[in-house]
């Protein structure tokens, strides 16, 4: 028999979403500012409503049942639509708007000053929160914790970062494509040698730990050639790798997007760029499509539409 929504306390759905996110009664209670006992009672009501355990206890926390997993996306969509409904007056007035972004750095650092000025000009009392793009950023977009993401994906056929592998709930727009360059200190000894693959591999490399991986399409291309680079240093972002590559006393080299030349000029880093020593077919596998990502439920959200247009315009002007 179909149950009526009028018989369900909608606060229980908020509790259910937080339990799914936290996988812990105690942590969910903390976020709701209630006691763990109150959350346990809510979970009991939810189990009775759905006639399913929803979660089972494990040594690692609460594990969702198959039914709970099947409801996760619908629940996130429902909560996001509820937030948009409550935020409706903010689309008529600039007061109180929040902008939540997840972006690759230094890409955001190049444009953030101009972007923030545009946001505050249009929405004077808006607040902005920017987080670095990370392995869980797509999930944050799905959960409604991030309005829009801005990051590079990959083109190598074997990459797990292909645009074609994005979740169906994610919409995207490619703003520009970038072929990474090799960045070396101005007095680096490699600059006195013929620039070829042997020279490129002769020196130690700085790598980026990207979405919990120290390797990327470059390493796949090298593997296909039966070659390998020596990764001597792994860092969390491109700005750190460029900073280290510019320091004296070592022979480290960095590979970073071509757009980083704007970042280097801004910070006056003494770096010289060289092309990746590969043929055209190999370089095609290394192209990085820099992409805006948002949830489909936000495709017609006025705030997100405006933000996408603002970032698009800035990219054409600055990159």
UniProtKB/Swiss-Prot annotation:
Keywords annotated in UniProt: DNA-binding, Transcription, Transcription regulation
PROSITE patterns membership: HTH_LYSR (PS50931)
Signal peptide per UniProt: none
SUPFAM superfamilies named in the record: Periplasmic binding protein-like II (SSF53850), Winged helix' DNA-binding domain (SSF46785)
Ranges for domain HTH lysR-type: 8-65
Single GO BP term: regulation of DNA-templated transcription
One GO molecular-function entry: DNA-binding transcription factor activity
Residues in the DNA-binding region annotation: 25-44
Annotated InterPro entries: LysR-type_TF, LysR_subst-bd, Tscrpt_reg_HTH_LysR, Tscrpt_reg_YidZ, WH-like_DNA-bd_sf, WH_DNA-bd_sf, YidZ_PBP2
Family: Belongs to the LysR transcriptional regulatory family.
Protein name, as recorded: HTH-type transcriptional regulator YidZ
Taxonomic source organism: Salmonella typhimurium (strain LT2 / SGSC1412 / ATCC 700720)
Phylogenetic classification of the source organism: Bacteria, Pseudomonadati, Pseudomonadota, Gammaproteobacteria, Enterobacterales
Gene that this polypeptide is encoded by: yidZ
